[in-house]
Amino acid sequence: MSLANLRTHYTAEVKPESVDNGQKITLAGWIHEVRDLGGICFVVLRDREGKAQVTLVKKKIDKELFDAARRLIRESVISVTGSVKFEEKAPNGYELLPEEIKVLNVAGSPLPMDTTGKVEAELDTRLDSRFIDLRRAETTAVFKIRHEALQAIREYFVKNKFIETATPKVVATATEGGTALFPITYFDREAFLNQSPQLFKQILMGGGFDRVFEIGPIFRAEEHDTRRHLNEATSIDVEVSFADHFDVMEILENLVAHIYTRVIENCKASLEILGVELKVPKTPFLKLTYDEVIEIVNSRCEEKMHWGDDLGTLGEHTVGNYVYETTGESHYFIIDWPTEIKPFYAMPYEDRPEFSKSFDMMHRTMELSSGAQRIHISELLKSRIESQGLNPDGFEFYLKAFEYGMPPHAGWGMGCERFVMTMLGTENIRDTVLFPRDRRRLSP
């Protein structure tokens, strides 16, 4: 028997415009629920696309088939062949009248957690039994939307003449200095998991690639234990030659609007499952200077922000609420950050070097992206590396690219999980990644 015979349709594909009433089809999936009412038995089959009701009337079908259906165990895997009967009251608007039910695998009992939504489970319980949690409609919906967002990102970049790249994740030195690195043994040497593709993106600008993007993992050995931090995340990175920070901000805000548009158009069922209503953010996004942000925070908070401070969680919420109250929008930029609190490669303004040509793209609740025009002048770059207490010798492979014709360039990086989290309003970032890695979780 060919496994292809185990399914002819997904549950959501059975519609009057594509399937005839009475047509024989085969569905395959998991047993979501069995309801035995004596003379009639309902088996709810669930697959990736939704649910279908299999209806067995005792007087109308083979007794052996009816009795077997009553004994089915939830979450077992089955394949059901039968005829379609369109029925408005049934899930998805039809029911399947079975001729054959094949049990492909029997689920153990009791289940480690409920999949129907009748019994809530804590996040740690769900993650410990992720194989079951992924069967929940709400969990599936999040990852369908994440998939659509990533497809939209690639579509946008390809349309705008970007080249997709893949840079090393095992490196000999820190991308941005600091100690937030995971050391590994690389044969007889120490190496690290990469924090960011930043240095390699810039080398590609020197190589003439002009416009690049990457979607890939990054690793941060930070001991944060919050609802919005991960130690392994997916970063969406961009670098553009012959561009400044305003140019790449425009690319970023248009990308955000494009993602929202695609998700709204193509993920209606998943959004409905999650109870989320989206609107496309208006562009261009509001731009606030760092100095303006200080004024907003200090006018609304008892705890004052001083020049040179980073924007903490309270400040992010304060400014985010201000922007939402004044514009009705959740996304905005903070520009012109102090040079000393940005990475060494951020370009200072020529006429006021204490400020950098840098930005953060913010959501009402948190930072989503950081970017800047980069330093493309070799001597200035070396000076900035030294000013941050780093040794230029450790960046020789990177600095060499700036000695032989590096164009002006700019770029940014954005966390995929944070983006999905803020778009869907999920409470915890771990809900937006299949198998999260944080300081306490290394399995599954």
Curated annotation (Swiss-Prot):
Mg(2+) 2 binds at residues 367, 370. Pfam families: tRNA-synt_2, tRNA_anti-codon. Its EC number is 6.1.1.23. Gene3D superfamilies: Bira Bifunctional Protein, Domain 2, Nucleic acid-binding proteins. GO terms for biological process: aspartyl-tRNA aminoacylation. InterPro entries: Aa-tRNA-synt_II (IPR004364), aa-tRNA-synth_II (IPR006195), aa-tRNA-synth_II/BPL/LPL (IPR045864), Asp-tRNA_synthase_2 (IPR004523), Asp/Asn-tRNA-synth_IIb (IPR002312), NA-bd_OB-fold (IPR012340), NA-bd_OB_tRNA (IPR004365). Residues 198-201 are annotated as: Aspartate. Binds 3 Mg(2+) cations per subunit. The strongest magnesium site (Mg1) is bound to the beta- and gamma-phosphates of ATP and four water molecules complete its coordination sphere. SUPFAM superfamilies: Class II aaRS and biotin synthetases, Nucleic acid-binding proteins. The keyword Cytoplasm applies. ATP binds at residues 220-222, 228-230, 367, 415-418. Mg(2+) 3 binds at residue 367. Its main location: cytoplasm. GO terms for cellular component: aminoacyl-tRNA synthetase multienzyme complex; cytosol. Keywords: Aminoacyl-tRNA synthetase, ATP-binding, Cytoplasm, Ligase, Magnesium, Metal-binding, Nucleotide-binding, Protein biosynthesis. It catalyses: tRNA(Asx) + L-aspartate + ATP = L-aspartyl-tRNA(Asx) + AMP + diphosphate. L-aspartate binds at residues 176, 220, 370, 374. One of its GO terms (molecular function) is aspartate-tRNA(Asn) ligase activity. The record marks 91 as: Important for tRNA non-discrimination. Its cofactor is Mg(2+). Homodimer. Belongs to the class-II aminoacyl-tRNA synthetase family. Type 2 subfamily. Aspartyl-tRNA synthetase with relaxed tRNA specificity since it is able to aspartylate not only its cognate tRNA(Asp) but also tRNA(Asn). Reaction proceeds in two steps: L-aspartate is first activated by ATP to form Asp-AMP and then transferred to the acceptor end of tRNA(Asp/Asn). This is Aspartate--tRNA(Asp/Asn) ligase. It comes from Methanosarcina acetivorans (strain ATCC 35395 / DSM 2834 / JCM 12185 / C2A). The gene is aspS.
